[in-house]
Curated annotation (Swiss-Prot):
Residue ranges for the DNA-binding region feature of this UniProt entry: 142-161
Gene3D superfamilies listed in its UniProt record: lambda repressor-like DNA-binding domains
Organism classification: Archaea, Methanobacteriati, Methanobacteriota, Thermococci, Thermococcales
Keyword Metal-binding belongs to the record: no
Keyword Ribonucleoprotein on entry: no
Xref: Pfam families: HTH_3
Keywords for the protein's UniProt record, in alphabetical order: DNA-binding, Transcription, Transcription regulation
Name of this protein: Putative HTH-type transcriptional regulatory protein PH1808
Stretches assigned to the HTH cro/C1-type domain: 131-189
């Protein structure tokens, strides 16, 4: 299955299970699909080979997920070494990766994955508190239970503290010993975004000038390299995000990017704006295109947001 076929296949799954979707046709983008259902928002990258996912794409995807309180996911079919298996969670640069089958099972059948692939094989996460309670209830010392399992005391202590994943073999032995389920499902929707840095390093002089002006207006700016927009501009007081594009001049590519920004803004409940060095003011699919000179005359964030709203309303 080629990448475009995979994107369409994944989108079909999401639509069947009640998601509203937007497909991003942008070469090299950090995501291919935005999907929303009730309060859940997903940014999904679909790749036949998940090893083609770059670290730069991963960093941008994590930034977007943190800014929009979304879940980032990589959906694929294989790695460079093997086919991906249903029910198993893989990981690339801190982004969980699953198969289309696992995606369907999670949402349509309520069956979250239980197994995580790490270097050396397949592992599970177990309920450490429950394990300790069962061990004490059955009268086993740490040394005795470790001996039964064929592992070290230190390993068992780490399992009870939830500090380590457990091999499938050991997990099965534990459940046989206690006749109780101990394996915890893996919540692939809960991404580890706490340490994600929301940087704003510009790629060129024009970006630098626009970013500096936006910050002077009282807005924060987060640089995104692998999307149809250049940055997310955030107005903190009212919690408003702007998908912000920047170009030297208006071209066909600018208009295509503006259309994609319009579609994404609608799905995520945001607004879009483009700042172009050489252009006249106009609106493309609800996305205002502002001459850079006009931006320079704006005095604060409220004035910019009001201008965007007025231009959208009049278009």
């Amino acid at each position: 299955m080629e990448r475009n076929e995979l994107v369409n296949f994944v989108e079909g799954i999401l639509k069947r299970i009640g998601f509203r979707t937007m497909k991003l046709e942008f070469r090299g983008g950090c995501f291919d699909l935005v999907a929303t259902r009730q309060l859940l928002l997903l940014f999904i990258k679909a790749l036949a080979n998940i090893d083609k996912f770059s670290e730069e794409q991963a960093e941008d995807l994590k930034k977007l997920a943190k800014l929009f309180k979304a879940s980032p996911l990589l959906v694929g079919l294989r790695s460079k070494n093997a086919e991906l298996e249903d029910g198993v969670v893989y990981e690339r640069f801190g982004i969980y990766a699953i198969t289309p089958g696992t995606l369907y099972s999670m949402f349509a059948e309520g069956e979250p994955p239980l197994i995580i692939a790490e270097r050396g094989g397949f592992y599970v996460r177990i309920d450490g508190k429950k394990l300790k309670a069962l061990r004490e209830e059955h009268g086993y010392s740490i040394t005795e239970l470790a001996g039964i399992l064929g592992i070290s005391r230190k390993s068992l202590q780490r399992y009870e503290k939830g500090e380590s994943v457990v091999s499938l073999e050991v997990a099965l032995r534990l459940e046989e010993v206690f006749d109780e389920p101990l394996v915890k499902p893996i919540d692939v929707l809960r991404a580890r975004l706490k340490d994600v840095t929301l940087t704003s390093e510009p790629d060129n002089i024009l970006e630098k000038e626009v970013f500096e002006k936006l910050r002077k207006l009282g807005m924060s700016v987060v640089k995104i390299k692998t999307a149809p927009f250049n940055a997310i501009t955030k107005e903190e007081e009212d919690d408003i995000e702007l998908l912000t594009g920047i170009d030297e001049r208006k071209t066909g590519r600018t208009l295509k990017r503006a259309e994609l920004v319009s579609q994404m803004a609608e799905v995520v409940g945001s607004d879009g704006v483009f700042v172009v060095k050489k252009a006249r003011m106009e609106v493309v699919r609800n996305v205002p295109i502002l001459p850079k000179k006009l931006l320079e005359e704006i005095k604060d964030a409220d004035e910019l947001l009001e201008l965007i709203r007025d231009l959208k309303f009049k278009s």
